């Protein structure tokens, strides 16, 4: 789990402990947060079962949420699950989301926070 002080955006990586793409999802999220300079709290949330997945709104492992919203603009799945997740990216199938999706989600979250006067 990684956090930054004065976080304004919440980023959750929902994943099983044994998920083969959990580590790479975290690396990509941290890299995008660093590149954008957007203050964010990054948390890895254990999703051990389909019940956990439903509770946390995970469409597979790993799922990346920014302020509670999936970063994938066009998810392949609609059911909550702790199974491995495949993302449809411009590179082809991938086990983690595109950095651009994470960046766009962070920018939307900041714009939403600012427009609501809560920033």
Identify what each model region corresponds to.
Residues 1-41, 45-59, 63-119:
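Non-globular targeting/processing and membrane-anchoring segments
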